Amino acid sequence: MKYLIVGLGNIGPEYHETRHNIGFMVLDALARANNLSFTDGRYGFTTTLSVKGRQMILLKPSTFMNLSGNAVRYWMQKENIPLENVLIIVDDLALPFGTLRLKSKGSDAGHNGLKHIATILGTQNYARLRFGIGNDFPRGGQIDFVLGHFTDEDWKTMDERLETAGEIAKSFCLAGIDITMNQFNKK
C-alpha cells in the first residue's frame, strides 16, 4: 500500500530551516534517520521509505508554498494514491512551538499551502499534521516571523520534535489516522 507524505516549504537556500519550512525539515529528518536521500523529480524532491510492507513516498514540493496543490495532485495521480493515504505536514502559528496536532480534515487556517491544496483537490478532507511554530511576533510581523529562523530555545528540542513528527507520519501509514490521533495528540 502506498502513502504520500508531503512536507510543505519554500524552495531556495534563503528559506532553509525557516519556520515556514518545518514540513521540509520533518521529511529531511525522517529520510536522514533511514539513510535515504531525495531525488529531484517533477514538481518536487522525493524518496521512498518502506515500513512493514507500506511505501511512504516523501515529497518536498519544488513549487512555491502557494502552489503546493499542483505537486500533491501530480504525485497522487502518478502513484495512484487515494486521498485517505495523503498526509500534509505544515507549520502552524496557532500552536506553541513544537506542539504536534494530527487532524483528519479541517480548514486551511489562513495557510496558503493548505488553501491551494484544497482548491486543487476540491476538498479540505485530507489529513494534516500541524507543527506548532509559535506566534511571538509584533502586530503586522507575521510574514517576517514565518520566514524567519528558529530561536536558540527552539533548537534545544528540535531534534526530538522532528523525530516525533516522523513517528506520527509512520503511525499514520501503519495504524491509521484515528489510532495515531489518539496516541499522539494528547502529548
UniProtKB/Swiss-Prot annotation:
It comes from the Bacteria. This is Peptidyl-tRNA hydrolase. It is found in: Cytoplasm. InterPro entries: Pept_tRNA_hydro (IPR001328), Pept_tRNA_hydro_CS (IPR018171), Pept_tRNA_hydro_sf (IPR036416). It catalyses: an N-acyl-L-alpha-aminoacyl-tRNA + H2O = an N-acyl-L-amino acid + a tRNA + H(+). The gene is pth. Keywords: Cytoplasm, Hydrolase, RNA-binding, tRNA-binding. TRNA binds at residues 15, 64, 66, 112. The record marks 91 as: Stabilizes the basic form of H active site to accept a proton. The record marks 10 as: Discriminates between blocked and unblocked aminoacyl-tRNA.
